[in-house]
């Protein structure tokens, strides 16, 4: 038996659970005194970012500033030094030497750094209750599950947390990116992971089962027939007859659009 724990199952895994191949249980009870993260989708505005970071700084907290590309981090550092000189930023990304990265993370843990400027390497494994503000640069470039995981880095204490998903002020977003941001903004209550995963499956498709990239048996037999075969196999395994051959109950009908009778002229 294998127990898998996830905040947002990927579409293919979720589809396996919904179709009965895997069992699914939801943990919907939030920790005591946990507050939902307030989420805002906004065009990039230096004034908004300054106010958000200063509010967190003056209440004794810390902030994350996440960019999708390493190339943007140094520019972000210069922007913060010029726009919010009251806070002390530090940079972290996956191409740094291990010792340098460890030093930066240790400084952030010890509250010697106010703002951690990083890529999405911080999306999992961090539990810093004093970090309760998140700024996402170019949030339209992140996937829905990534957005949700990154938002989960804040609000891990008893204080209200705030997430700002910034987009280019002079660029129109494509429909998919706009939909992702709208979904995350609307699902700002606690325990929304399953709802986020369901929306993610709806946007991206469910992998080889229902997505655009179908292959193998699914493509050959079609979605409807494959689902029927899958349901039959699952039912048979649940009944304890996992090794038996699945009976061939299919009666194919062939329609060629022409008469197959012997013509009278031939007789």
Which residues are covered by each model-predicted region?
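Inter-lobe coupling/hinge segments of SF2-like helicase ATPases
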Residues: 1-182, 195, 242
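C-terminal or mid-to-C-terminal helical accessory/interaction module adjacent to the motor/catalytic core
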Residues: 178-265
């Amino acid at each position: 038996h294998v127990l898998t724990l996830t905040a947002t199952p990927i579409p293919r895994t979720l589809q396996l659970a919904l179709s009965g191949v895997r069992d699914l249980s939801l943990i919907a009870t939030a920790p005591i005194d946990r507050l939902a993260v307030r989420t805002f989708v906004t065009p990039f505005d230096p004034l908004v970012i300054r106010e958000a970071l200063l509010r967190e700084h003056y209440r004794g907290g810390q902030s994350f500033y996440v960019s999708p590309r390493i190339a943007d981090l140094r520019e972000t550092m210069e922007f913060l030094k010029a726009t919010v000189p009251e806070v002390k930023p530090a940079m972290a990304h996956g191409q740094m030497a291990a010792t340098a990265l460890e030093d930066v993370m240790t400084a952030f843990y010890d509250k010697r750094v106010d703002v951690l400027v990083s890529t999405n390497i911080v999306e999992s494994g961090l539990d810093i209750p004093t970090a309760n503000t998140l700024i996402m640069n170019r949030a339209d470039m992140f996937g829905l599950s990534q957005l949700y995981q990154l938002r989960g880095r804040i609000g891990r204490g008893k204080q209200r947390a705030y997430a700002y998903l910034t987009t280019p002020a002079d660029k129109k977003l494509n429909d998919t990116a706009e939909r992702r941001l709208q979904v995350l903004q609307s699902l700002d209550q606690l325990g929304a992971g399953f709802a986020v995963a369901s929306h993610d499956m709806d946007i991206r498709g469910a992998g080889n089962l229902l997505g655009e990239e179908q292959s193998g048996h699914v493509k050959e037999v079609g979605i409807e027939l494959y689902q029927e075969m899958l349901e039959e196999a699952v039912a048979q395994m649940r009944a304890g007859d996992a090794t038996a051959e699945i009976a061939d109950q299919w009666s194919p009908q062939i329609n060629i659009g022409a008469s197959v009778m012997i013509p009278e002229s031939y007789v």
